[in-house]
Regions:
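Short, Lys/Arg- and Gly-enriched loop/turn segments at beta-strand edges
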Residues: 44-55
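Beta-strand elements of well-folded, non-transmembrane domains
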Residues: 10-12, 100
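Ser/Thr- (and often Asn-) enriched beta-sheet segments in non-cytosolic proteins
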Residues: 3-7, 36-38, 93-97
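Short, structured beta-strand/loop micro-motifs enriched in basic residues and often containing a Trp
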Residues: 2, 13-22
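A short, structured loop/turn motif at beta-sheet edges
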Residues: 1-3, 30-33, 101
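Short, compact, well-ordered microdomains
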Residues: 56-104
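Intrinsically disordered, low-complexity acidic/polar segments
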Residues: 15-17, 48, 103
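Short, flexible N-terminal segments of the mature chain
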Residues: 20-44
Length: 104
């Protein structure tokens, strides 16, 4: 099983939607563009958002086991995926890449 690098590529915030539809929350997303996490196979990286992990864990698991080429040629690099979390108010886009390094 291989490790995967997860890089925060884009962080968006839709204040108009937040103001109109969201109840106030105590802790909003604190991901920063350029932030990098290493997934040790199927394990969620320490400090990584649980909701974002639930959106991407199947892709990480597939890549860590040598799979890829999602959706018949979707990504230029077949050992990668571009996934966003499911927060419609503050979506974050992540690049997931399989590494050559084995998971522990």
């Amino acid at each position: 099983m291989k490790k995967c690098r997860i890089t925060v590529m884009k962080v968006a915030r839709y204040d108009d939607l937040i103001e109109k539809y969201e109840n106030p929350i105590q802790h909003a997303c604190d991901m920063k563009e350029g932030q990098v996490f290493i997934a040790n196979g199927w394990e969620r990286p320490e400090g990584f958002c649980l909701s974002a992990w639930e959106s991407m864990s199947a892709f990480v698991l597939t890549l860590s086991h040598g799979g890829g080429d999602f959706y018949d040629g979707w990504m230029k690099n077949k050992k990668s995926a571009m996934i966003s979390c499911n927060d419609g108010f503050r979506p974050v886009s992540f690049l997931i890449e399989a590494l050559d390094e084995n998971a522990e």
